[in-house]
Swiss-Prot record:
A matching Pfam family: Cu_bind_like
Domain Phytocyanin positions: 1-96
Name assigned to this protein: Basic blue protein
InterPro entries per record: BlueCu_1_BS (IPR028871), Cupredoxin (IPR008972), Phytocyanin-like (IPR039391), Phytocyanin_dom (IPR003245), Plantacyanin (IPR041844)
Organism: Cucumis sativus (Cucumber)
Residues reported in the UniProt entry to bind Cu cation: H39, C79, H84, M89
Ubl conjugation as UniProt keyword: no
Entries under SUPFAM superfamilies matching the protein: Cupredoxins (SSF49503)
Amino acid sequence: AVYVVGGSGGWTFNTESWPKGKRFRAGDILLFNYNPXMHNVVVVNQGGFSTCNTPAGAKVYTSGRDQIKLPKGQSYFICNFPGHCQSGMKIAVNAL
């Protein structure tokens, strides 16, 4: 399945609650739609998600229309533009 992160609003502030109530499976695609001049998508670990810090070597997506295939287990994504993750621009997704 393909999921548009944030729905019609796209990847933006206060998307932290977007995954609630959805069932994700390994191999599902998350589609992140955003303005690449204003946001990005960074794959982080749980610590990076909690603290909004980007771990060294983290994968960064910047196209504005990123398709990311979910691995099994927990995945964490943030925007690391200053202050954005702190404003709820982050999601944690568990794929079965």
